Regions:
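Core catalytic lobe of class I
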Residues: 1-159
């Protein structure tokens, strides 16, 4: 793709190794851990910055991940702050972070999939209970060529 040719990037990246999108082991979803995932993203993210027009927006959809205690060895569910890791990752590659939109999700549906917030667990020990995880749209900009006004090189103007 040509440099500085894309007006908007809006994508939902894989959430580390949370989902497998295909059986292909070269797929972004096939990673041993979050560190390996971001090693793969280190190849993609500079390309996103390169093709985005100066001053334009990249909107990245992410979600924090529930880590189950039987997998982590803690014995209790914890939350991996994946959205915070993504903010650091994109900033490391030159994107300017300027906001986050919270996407409220259906906690009942999430509970039905994981059984971690159920009444039976509450009755055993309420201190174990967590909360449902919302999703986020992280907002980044590529710096414009002229930084004195913060306007994009090709402005998005209302007519």
């Amino acid at each position: 793709m040509e440099s500085n040719s894309i007006d908007l990037i809006h994508t939902s990246i894989p959430f580390g190794n949370h989902y497998e999108y295909s059986a292909n082991y070269n797929d972004f979803g096939h990673n041993q851990n979050t560190d390996r995932f971001f090693e793969q993203m280190d190849f993609l993210t500079p390309e996103l910055l390169r093709v985005l027009k100066p001053g334009r927006v990249a909107a990245i959809h992410v979600k924090d991940r529930v880590l189950f205690g039987n997998a982590t060895g803690t014995g209790m569910p914890t939350i991996e702050p994946f959205h915070a890791q993504c903010i650091s990752h994109y900033m490391k590659h030159g994107f300017q972070y300027f906001g986050m939109i919270t996407v409220v999700t259906d906690v009942v549906r999430e509970n039905n999939q994981t059984y971690r917030l159920g009444w039976t667990e509450q009755c055993k020990d309420g201190s174990k209970m967590g909360v449902g995880c919302p999703e986020y749209i992280l907002l980044f900009r590529k710096l414009p060529t002229d930084r004195s006004t913060a306007y994009a090189d090709t402005p998005v103007a209302k007519s």
